[in-house]
Amino acid sequence: MHFIVNKSIYFILSFLFIINCGNNNQKVYKQFDTIDISTTQFSQEDESAWNGGPGFEVYAEQLGWETNNNVVSIGSPDAIKGDTITLVGETIMPPTFRNIGKETRSQFLAIMEALAYQQLVVFNYETSKYEPELASHWRIGQDSLTYFFRIDPRAKWSDGRDVTAHDVVATYRLRVDKGHGDPTTYKSWDEDFYEPVVETKYIVSIKAKKKDWGNFGGIAKSYVYPSYYLNKIDGTTFLEKYQYEMMPGSGPYIIDMNLTTQDNNGLVVFSRRKDFWAIDEPSNIGLYNFDVINFIFIDDDNQEIERFFNGDYDIYSVSRAQWWNERFTAEEYPQIKRGLTQRLKVFNFKPTGVSGLSFNTKEWPFDDIEVRKAFSHIWNLDKLMDKLFFNEYVATNSYWPWSKYEHSDNPLQDYNPDKALQLLNEAGWQKNPDDKWLSKNGKIFEIDMYTYTGWDRIHNFLVNDLESIGIKLNLVVIQNTFEKYIQKTFTMHYGGWTGRPIPDPDQMLHSKYADDIDVTNATSMANKTIDSLIEAYETNWNLDERVQIIQQIDSIATREYHYIFGWAAPYGWRGLYQNRFGMPERGLSYGSNRYHKHWGGWANHILLWWSDPEKKELLRQARQSDTMSLPIDRELIDYWNKLSK
């Protein structure tokens, strides 16, 4: 029999529709709260190879589909499956287990999502190529607006059901539902895409509302959830139902709700799925090695350190340069000297995001750009680098620091208190000879800044810098400063955002989010020129021209002074670990803005490392001895020779 190949999937579907007579084999499902669905839901859907079923690979290239059959695992073939790893998740238990909706701007929630769910495809920034995940094949329609994905027929949810095109549709409907309370999500998805179309059981098409070179990546890298749960609820009931629950996922791990608890500051437990559908894929060799991943929560620095050296958990990220250089040394800790605890710094290309002091530009006093500009000359970063940071960090001066997207002529934010005072005087802030504080209209210049316990060591420098020119800064210690920031109930905030290898300025800098809460545009940037440039950036298919556009955006945004830029580490991770682990030669991944196997930052260990039985036994023996020492492993990993570049 001869088939006529046509690039249009619709042509194929209209002529090659084969009735599926069903399967009498019954599946046993785990107990989840589902809606009733017919066991013959897909009985009229064609599962032939031509329409995405098993054997599709034979015809895919003829039909214009793409895939990547040359994915090399970043894991080690020597990795050993089994055992448990325990990390500190955050300072406090997250307010939800959802990663869609309000209160979800959390790196830890992104980790939870990546353990349990999968994206359609994954982008590997090291190779600059897409890699299959839920979708084995993909293609872009001739109109450059329609994107097609073929779900791998082998893909299964953790309860045994098939992953299908219907799941992609249901996930889209959730994302655009305003009831979940996250305007960044529902606005962007509704503005960018029409509702996906189920072409066949395994093939889904998604049409964009405008030509945008970034649309494919936005769709491809989105996580997919099961339709037989989502079809029962809307955005509002999703918030209620899944506040502290997770739907079945297709990923390598599943949350263990029997062990997960909010008691004793909280514990979140994930178990490795022995029935993970892609467990034997060559691209997953050496990955997802731990049977159990525990996340504990500790909100006290001293307790966190004490519990690590007591062996209560396995990986400790050292956040303070002073501690790395003076405290966690062989001279101070016998465990380090004897090799029971290892030091490690990994260099990679994990992208650096914007960070520093940011302002609520909707509120006094930072609704005045001259005041914001003055603050850019008050903060003495050089003193911090020298006195506190041991020159471990590098100052930033861009929304996209150290990348080709950084504008070379961004305004210099140097320490110049005389210039700062001049700008404040011009803005109406004056200080009488007998006064300590600047004042305007009878009101002294006094502001509050929320901070975490222990951060006063850094921010006291700022308190003194501000006091020297007549500004009173009160540090208010709370548990969760980020919540105040994202809700826009702050005056000034120190923090930052995860970097992106490829910029997406829309959510952080477009004015359509300026008046919303729970958005990345927490400083309320609203600049019409930036808006126009963002729109030009999204529709420009020339990479070199896009770089120039982002540089223009960077130049304009930095001159709005919403951020007084801070510092960042030139490496991916610095910390301590119990000496019982094996790891790939690269240590961690290359780097990405999304938490998955290519992440390259904090907690990447749980996907690439493994428990070495021999090392574990030696560690046990050494802990029972006062004199036994273990080999000291390499303290620095620079697999990609970043230091020489």
Stretches with model-predicted labels:
Residues N25, K178, D182, P196, ...:
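Extracellular/periplasmic solute-recognition and catalytic clefts
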Residues F32-T34, N68-N69, L259, N265-L267, ...:
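Detector for C-terminal structural segments
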Residues G52-S73, D83-Q142, R173, P248-S250, ...:
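N-terminal lobe/hinge region of extracytoplasmic solute-binding protein
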Residues D78-I80, T185-G235, K241-Q243, P252-I254, ...:
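Surface-exposed binding/hinge segments that line
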Residues T86, T164-T171, K201-S205, P252, ...:
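Alpha-helical secondary-structure segments
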Residues I111-Q118, V122-K129, K221-L287, D291-V292, ...:
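Gly/Pro-rich hinge or "lid" segments in bacterial periplasmic/extracellular proteins
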Residues D152, K241, F276-E332, V463, ...:
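Ligand-site clamp/hinge motif
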Residues S158, K207-Y229, M247-Q303, R327-T352, ...:
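Aromatic-rich, solvent-exposed beta-strand/loop patch
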